[in-house]
Structure formats: C-alpha cells, structure tokens
Swiss-Prot record:
Lineage: Bacteria, Pseudomonadati, Pseudomonadota, Gammaproteobacteria, Alteromonadales
GO MF assignments: metal ion binding; phospho-N-acetylmuramoyl-pentapeptide-transferase activity; UDP-N-acetylmuramoyl-L-alanyl-D-glutamyl-meso-2,6-diaminopimelyl-D-alanyl-D-alanine:undecaprenyl-phosphate transferase activity
GO cellular component, one term: plasma membrane
Family from the record: Belongs to the glycosyltransferase 4 family. MraY subfamily.
Protein name: Phospho-N-acetylmuramoyl-pentapeptide-transferase
EC numbers for this chain: 2.7.8.13
One of the Pfam families matching this protein, by short name: MraY_sig1
Protein function: Catalyzes the initial step of the lipid cycle reactions in the biosynthesis of the cell wall peptidoglycan: transfers peptidoglycan precursor phospho-MurNAc-pentapeptide from UDP-MurNAc-pentapeptide onto the lipid carrier undecaprenyl phosphate, yielding undecaprenyl-pyrophosphoryl-MurNAc-pentapeptide, known as lipid I.
Length: 360
C-alpha cells in the first residue's frame, strides 16, 4: 500500500525511491510484523485467558504435557494479523503472487479457526470433523491450483524444478494442478502435525520462509535465474515481502511460544502457515525443494502414516507415540532437547536445500 504513496512522493523528493526496492521493503516488512507481534502479543494472551480459550491436552499423551492444559491457544491469529498488516503496508498490492498467498493464509486460517473454536469454545474435543476439514482444505487448494494454471503467462510458471539436475525441468501441463493441490494441502497438514511442542513448528517455518525469500528474490531476477538454471518468474520478487513478514511474525510469536509456552498457535496458525509455505513453493516452482527444506515436517507426517499403517496391518506400533516428537519424549528426552535438536535438523536441511541451487 505504502509503495504507491512513496511512488507519488518521489516526484517531490527522490529519497522516497528507496521504497521501490524489494529488499528495503522486505526488511521493513520483517520489522513491522515482528514489532506488531511483540506489542500485541501480551494483550492477546490476556484476552485469551479472560475468555478461557485454553489448550485441551490429550489424556493419553506424555505426562509432562498435563501442565500445559489451559494454556491459551489460537495464537495463530497473532501471527496472521502480523503478516497481513505487514504485507498490506509494504507489499505491491498489484501483484497476484501477493494475493495468492494472502488468500491461502486467510482460507486455511479460517478452517483452522473453526476447528479451534469448536474445540476450545464449544468444548467439542473432536473439533471440526476430519472429513469436512479435508473437504474445505481441498476446495481452497483446488481454487488456487486452477487459478495459477489458468493465469500462467510464462513457460517457467508450470515447469518442475528438480534439485541437483539443471537440465531437467519438465513441463507439468495439467498435472501442475494435481501437484499444486497436494503440495498445499500436504504442507498444511504436515506443519499441523509438527505443532505439538513449544516452538517446534514455528522455528522450522521461519527457516523455510527465510530460504524461500532468497529463492523468490533470485527467481524474480533474470540474471540470477539464468545463472542458477531456475525458472525466471517476473514479479516473483514481491514474494520476498510475504516471506519476510512470515519470518518476522513467526519470531514475534516465538517470543511467547518458546518453552514453557505462554500461548499456542492452534490450528488457525499451523494450517495457515503450512499452506502458505506450500503455496510459495508452488509459486516459485520448488515443490521438491520444500520436501527437502521442510524435512522435519515430512518426518513428522511419515511417522504418523507408518504408525497408523503398522497398527492397522500388524496390530503393532513402530513408535511409542506419533508424531515422532512424542516418541522421543516418552524415551525420556526433555521437551527442550527434542525441540532444539529438531531445530538443528531443520537448519541443516534448509542449508542443504539452498545448496542445491548451485549443486546442479
């Protein structure tokens, strides 16, 4: 929004031209989201406590989690508010890239809000029925997938980038819709499954978003894109502001979500952030890279699939409890140790993912 005001004011004072640079606006976007969350966080936590919107802890979970019962949840509203305010202030609102991610955040955030509301306000322990949750997620993802496919202006927008192979970038055709759908829905649910310990999901989300900020910047510049053999995507640079807003809001939320957490993000946060990462990966054509950089999310999801599959087929469990972070808790690892070690794994995987841009 302010980019248009700055553009107008440039005719009176050339210094306002600095707002035309994506990098400058990205820094302001990160700082805006961070400061907003740090400022509004305590107020929101007190409000959630007043409304008695507290976390419901599973009776079959680790005993160490019983003390978390009643901790304010639905803190994802704080994250989303920080992102929206930051992007609307510093982003180019004429960019379809920006609006695609905002739509994904809003739609999946609404789904998560309904789920959380039913759990903590209406005291329905099941929340939104899984079938309806999946249907709503699918509807939102299909809308975005069809829109991106129909509005693609360049060849690069529907190519698939294969890490480590610079000459393999097949045209997806209509299969682009299928890949986009599974990337967005899969990423949304993967982050949701990871959000089981204090700060466990938000820090890897911040790391992946920061990496995508760099990738979006490179994809939006023809020289860098050609040098790295990745699709050149005109206008993709505006995603940098979105990504840095996610980083800023995520760090601001982590201030209150670090162990022992004062607030949880709830499904309103985890479903929205996961879907946003998936949408950004689709927009910059790096779906496979998301699997690498978001390896912690993948690991958590696979552990649940293996656990359920093994129990149904053999009547035996592979892990003491799934998702896998609970397995390590039941092995005796203190919660902070599990969290930090998963962060370290995530950092390694993000660096590995970025390295693939050159190792081709």
């Amino acid at each position: 929004m302010l980019v248009y005001l700055a553009e107008y004011l440039t005719q009176f004072y050339s210094g306002f031209n600095v707002f035309s640079y994506v990098t400058f606006r990205a820094i302001l976007g990160l700082m805006t989201a961070l400061v907003f969350c740090l400022w509004w966080g305590p107020k929101m936590i007190r409000r959630l406590q007043t409304l008695q919107i507290g976390q419901v802890v599973r009776s079959d979970g680790p005993e160490s989690h019983f003390s978390k019962s009643g901790t304010p949840t639905m803190g994802g509203i704080l994250i989303l508010a920080g992102i929206f305010i930051s992007v609307l202030l510093w982003g180019d609102l004429g960019s379809r890239y920006v609006w695609v991610v905002l739509f994904v955040l809003a739609s999946f955030g609404l789904i998560g809000f309904i789920d959380d509301y039913r759990k903590v306000v209406r005291k329905d322990t099941k929340g939104l029925i899984a079938r309806w949750k999946y249907i709503l997620q699918s509807l939102a993802a299909i809308i975005i997938a069809f829109y991106l496919y129909a509005s693609a202006d360049t060849v690069g927008e529907t190519q698939l980038v294969v890490p480590f192979f610079k000459d393999i970038m097949p045209q997806m055709g209509a299969f682009f819709i299928v890949l986009a759908y599974f990337t967005i829905v899969g990423s949304s649910n993967a982050v949701n499954l990871t959000d089981g310990l204090d700060g466990l999901a938000i820090m890897p989300t911040v790391m992946v978003a920061a990496a995508f900020a760099l990738i979006a910047y490179l994809s939006g510049h023809v020289q860098f894109a050609n040098y790295l053999h990745i699709p050149y995507l005109p206008g993709a640079g505006e995603l940098v502001i979105v990504c840095t807003a996610i980083v800023g809001a995520g760090l601001g939320f982590l201030w209150f979500n670090t162990y022992p957490a004062q607030v949880f993000m709830g499904d309103v946060g985890s479903l929205a952030l996961g879907a946003a990462l998936g949408a950004i990966a689709v927009l910059v054509r790096q779906e496979i890279l998301l699997v690498i950089m978001g390896g912690v999310f993948v690991m958590e999801t696979v552990s649940v699939i293996l656990q359920v599959g093994s129990y149904k087929l053999r009547g035996q469990r592979i892990f003491r409890m799934a998702p896998i972070h609970h397995h390590y808790e039941l092995k005796g690892w203190p919660e902070p140790r599990v969290i930090v070690r998963f962060w370290i794994i995530s950092l390694f995987l993000v660096m590995l993912g970025l390295a693939t841009l050159k190792l081709r």
